[in-house]
Amino acid sequence: MKTLKTYKFRLNPNEATLELLKQHGGNGRFLWNQLVSFSKDFNDQKGRFPTQSELQKQIVVLKEENDFLKTSHSQPLQINAKRLNKTNFDSIKPEKIKERKIKLAKAKTPKQKAKALNFGKPKHKSKHDKNDSIFYPQNFKVKKGRIFVAKIGWIPFIKHRDILGVPKTLTINQDGEQWFCSIVCEIKLKQINKKPLSEANIVGIDVGLTTFATMSDGSKIENPRTLRKNLKKLKKEQKRISRRKFIKTEINGNSVKSSSKNRIKQKNKVRRIHRKVKNVRSDFLHKTSHYMIAKYDGVIIETLGIKNMLENGNSNQNRETNDVSWFEFGRKLEYKAKQNEKYFVKIERFFPSTKTCSKCKSIKDMELKDRTYKCPVCGLEINRDHNAAINILEEGIKVLKNTTGTVGINACGQSAVADMVEARKVSKTACAA
């Protein structure tokens, strides 16, 4: 079986190469901004978005008008047409329009309303964001800790691991003052014989904010709270940005405000903190998901309505929810289970894992402050997260038994809603008795 794997390395360019990277990244950003403006004008005049071929023709026109674009390779420039075309048509999908209306209804200030109206639509890029990227679908080489890209040359990178497989695409991206390369390789996985389905070594996982993960066998993994540990320092450095001055210059009779050197330095400090938080979080998720897949033959988790949580929560709760990265944890578990021929199940989000008694299957309502599940029917007292993990395990095993041999390694629970309705009927009957 073949799969794609991405290797990310930090580039170590000299001054001349660094200037070329900035120039090529700036060319791509300039072209994107020009295409966004062209797309908006085109839509205003003709009532539709330009097609990908029409955007590509506009690139030819822009290259004739701006000679500096010819210094960049054509493929990284042409990819802007494909991406803008996708973004345009994604912005008019029914779900995006619905979400835009919801955000507009909640907006109170003119700034919030303007932001809501532009939600999901392509936006102009700023050079001050320092997040330029250059995409190469081909015309690059990887050799002994260096990459070769057309019209730039050889660029050394800090090689911290071997690159396996056949390189397919290359993305060079800027993160503040640093540059990175992401090499997507096609690798052939070793043939692993999938173990027969056995309930003995399958685990159900309930994720949360207080405890990151509670397993059905009673073990727990604490929430590292990566952002909270760096929040005080981050706020301090962000406040310093507001104290740094702008420089006003006159260009063609117009006053233009730009960041001073000290302001740019301070912004880079904030970017470094954000990068550290992101890397620590990613490292934790990789190690935790690897541990789960290595230890167990099967992993069962529930689908969470994270978007609804963020819409209904307060700012502090939303910050914690974003920091814990439940979706990314589930994604890593899923692809690692697939690569290692392990069982993986995501049960329905409406399955009442927390409200259901893991012993008698009766259902009772619970508040968030209730940390112990006390069943009014059978008298069971158990930690609410442990109780939920057991229910997730049992529901996932039902799904596995129904799908193993037909669907394959991964499956999504389809019987959870029907079982939930039936469980409520049983609960009402038991309580009435």
Predicted feature descriptions by range:
Residues 1-77:
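Gly/serine-rich nucleotide phosphate-binding loop at the start of the catalytic core
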Residues 37, 318-320, 324-433:
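Positively charged, low-complexity nucleic-acid-binding target-recognition regions
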Residues 42-44, 48-65, 175-330, 402-433:
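Substrate-contacting helices/loops that form the catalytic groove of nucleic-acid
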Residues 52-173, 323:
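Acidic carboxylate diad motif detector
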Residues 143, 175, 216-219, 360, ...:
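Short acidic-glycine loop/turn motifs at beta-strand connectors
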Residues 144-150, 211-215, 371-374:
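Short polybasic amphipathic segments
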Residues 146-156, 183-188, 217-219, 379:
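Secondary-structure transition/turn motif
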